[in-house]
């Protein structure tokens, strides 16, 4: 990014907190649509003069001046047409605007990583990087707060929060227009369905806004944690997750009131850990149930005072790790007690010693997984495989490749499960659904196709791990059985893909 700053003239705009002129630079749209930076884009005609200063200015003018109150015999048709054109203009401009507002935060993130000398930060982007952390920490904790982060946030509150970072009034007005245009209401984030709708229109902009909201929310928690802990973290770091998690800040305004120190006294607990993925977070601690209840009601007041959100207390659950399972990121996680009896011999006397060991257990929730397959039309609600009729127009090799890729991705993601037997039901559903799809395409029976394809058909549904292990070790060896049953966490899984994306 640094070597392109002199072409973008970023230093000059950033110094004066003025980003609005960047909207009229055509290379911004080249970056937005090509999703990459190279010297030829910035110096040459990146997008064939599609986004010149005059064109962008004209689009912004039309975007602001569209009139939806046209009275004519064809009013409904004209309104729908102009509404479509207005959305088109705003979407085109907002793509470039998303790149602009990301620039200062991206540079802050890069500088923070350099200051803390975090070189291999790409490993922290992986979803699976959370689970080794849970395995290491949760064995020593007692209680966990299962938090559904409240999502209704008023547009004006978000804009006012952004004013601390973007002091350009024109950019803020344009952002306010996008928010009201896309949502046409009082809440920016109302449900997962709304987020998906926003993402389809302008994924980059609204993911940035959602990440910024989460960043502001978490910065206060990090500040409280560092100020209240006896064992302050000296290398907190910045966790980089490109899609869902933009960054964690550890600096806040130093204006402290007298009552604030009372709050810090309530949360003096060195063994408190926080994890978040999308709109769900976990706050685990070794403390007592009383202190966890204080955390719960403090968080409720925190949402009300800082974001004008009135969350319901039932959105924050207090669970004991020893007798409750935690539904997080597609796994049912719990701390299980394994008891074992050891015989000890001392001279002529023998003793039976009972030993209890805590073990972090991760289970695949098979019912929700089958429900996801049913929603994607691979099976019915009972888990019986059906044909994927929308794929019958594809070539046989493409159909087999799609089913095999989905199966491998599922096994890849759930490779860290302590009980993998339930995954073979998923493999059975996908394999038979693939056979039914091919049989439906060729107007044949499933039995005939399975007999025709033979063992080659099965190879598409082997996971990469099974292929490698089958080449290195015999399947019946004890070492191989241990590896098949063992957990494997990966540091290259950035997000969970929807089954329907391949359509």
From Swiss-Prot:
GO cellular component, one term: chloroplast
Gene Ontology MF annotations: RNA binding
Main location: plastid
Keywords noted in UniProt: Chloroplast, mRNA processing, Plastid, RNA-binding, tRNA processing
Location of the protein in the cell: Plastid, Chloroplast
PANTHER family: MATURASE K
Name this protein carries in UniProt: Maturase K
Lineage: Eukaryota, Viridiplantae, Streptophyta, Embryophyta, Tracheophyta
The encoding gene: matK
